[in-house]
């Protein structure tokens, strides 16, 4: 009994964990409780770091594998030589596996703790299957077989026609089923953890290299596997140098490629896990900057199937003659419509300030028009026609002498002169008035009777339907008559111009709210039988044709305002 007790005490001193069961059995057999081992001699148990959830680790590895460091999408199997069959090797997977072997060799360097790697099995650190070496070196590989466990995960290299589905999954991402120990991710200060993270970054960089670089890099890393068993520091330095050299070569080749192809940008989705588009092509970013206004301020995709009024194409209706909008990628400058800032600061605050400013504006516009007429753009195509040189007269189109024509009889008396018109059929009088107007203004494409009829419709819509005041209607008349006298109106766009003038006058002359603007657009669409999109798109061409002069002087608005007050 004493011998058994002495034997149990000796076993407790020699081993703290493995022989404890034997001493307990001996003590139980003898019936004597052995003394507890001294706490000073027992070695402390190694601290267990919190184990990462395998699902979170798998998700993190999958995310890090699918992203790329230079913005390119992850490469698929068919782009890395998908035509090879059977024992053919994939350069992308081959390079990734060689990098995995290099990272594992760095972990197995002398002086590093290999206990976390060999805890689950008695194999060497980071074991690789025998089929890895022939696959890396480009030799025919053998049928798939399972490899020793790496912390509970298996690295399988399926090859051949038998494992088609698994081969597609494995070769698409060589790191999907490889789980690195949690010590390398949770901040262990050993050199093995640093080398493992660096090897993983090298694998990500290698995965996006061209095919030629992948083959060359795999050979270099295989040579490092054979010669890097002595020390991990030299192997890591060589890995870093090789990676920097390959990145610089890749960037230089991409620069040359971009120069040769007029610097196109690769526009594709870079979402994590999203497949690369099959019809992948390079699109220049300037060609992709066309927004909605593609053809003369309109979107033909939205309105291509709709037939417009007057059996005219949409391209002919939208846009005013002589108005450049910068369609089809052209750049148009409107700086000639601007006035100098000091024109507003040098005016005196007197009663005739409005008249002096209006005279200055008319003189500036006259000199501007004459300057444009003397330039190389003084042609009808550029908009410098007869109407651009005329000063606007608010009484011109409302002159009561227009309907007289050849049917009038002038009576001269000593103190006054009067005109008498005999009875004439209204149709003949209208025809005579339009002919006289056409002779005097040949550049205006609409007749005088049609212009006056449109003005009556504008007034009825603005005052009766929308409740606008007379100054707003007078401003709309000025805008519309300026377009008519400059020859911008025709039979196809006359209602669009009238609606755009009413809309601009309502925005400038009235404080409209959102629902009021919507109500006005609805009324214009109903009364003038217009399309809402065409009306809104026509607003900017009218603004350009008016030379952005929406704030009108008093002498242009007051005559129309007086006539509206008298007739109401």
UniProtKB/Swiss-Prot annotation:
Phosphothreonine PTM positions: 350
Where Phosphoserine occurs along the chain? Answer: 248, 274
Amino acid composition bias (Basic and acidic residues), ranges on this chain: 46-56
InterPro entries under this entry?
Answer: CABLES1/2 (IPR012388), Cyclin-like_sf (IPR036915), Cyclin_N (IPR006671)
Residue stretches of biased makeup (Pro residues): 33-45
Which residue ranges are recorded for the region named Disordered?
Answer: 1-94, 130-169
A Pfam family assignment:
Cyclin_N
Q: Which GO terms describe its cellular component?
A: cytosol; growth cone; nucleoplasm
Give the transmembrane ranges.
Answer: none
What residue spans carry the Low complexity bias annotation? 1-31
Q: Which parts of the sequence are annotated with region: Interaction with TDRD7?
A: 1-98
Describe tissue expression.
Ubiquitous. Expressed in postnatal day 1 (P1), in postmitotic neurons of the subplate, cortex (V/VI) and marginal zone; in postnatal day 7 (P7), in all layers of the cerebral cortex and in the CA1 and CA2 regions of the hippocampus (at protein level). Highly expressed in brain, kidney, liver and lung.
Biological process GO annotation list? cell division; G1/S transition of mitotic cell cycle; nervous system development; regulation of cell cycle
Q: Keywords, A to Z?
A: Cell cycle, Cell division, Cell projection, Cyclin, Cytoplasm, Nucleus, Phosphoprotein
User: Which superkingdom does the taxonomy of this entry point to?
Assistant: Eukaryota
Ranges for the region named Interaction with CDK3 are: 140-427
**Describe its PTM?**
Phosphorylated on Ser-274 by CCNE1/CDK3. Phosphorylated on serine/threonine residues by CDK5 and on tyrosine residues by ABL1. Also phosphorylated in vitro by CCNA1/CDK2, CCNE1/CDK2, CCNA1/CDK3 and CCNE1/CDK3.
Annotated consequence of substituting residue 274 to A? Less efficiently phosphorylated in vitro
Where found?
Nucleus; Cytoplasm; Cell projection, Growth cone
Self-association and partners: Found in a complex with p53/TP53. Found in a number of complexes with CDK2, CDK3, CDK5, ABL1, TDRD7, CDK17, CCNA1, CCNE1 and TP73. Interacts with CDK2, CDK3, CDK5, ABL1 and TDRD7.
- Record's function text: Cyclin-dependent kinase binding protein. Enhances cyclin-dependent kinase tyrosine phosphorylation by nonreceptor tyrosine kinases, such as that of CDK5 by activated ABL1, which leads to increased CDK5 activity and is critical for neuronal development, and that of CDK2 by WEE1, which leads to decreased CDK2 activity and growth inhibition. Positively affects neuronal outgrowth. Plays a role as a regulator for p53/p73-induced cell death.
The entry's family comment says:
Belongs to the cyclin family.
Q: What is this protein called?
A: CDK5 and ABL1 enzyme substrate 1
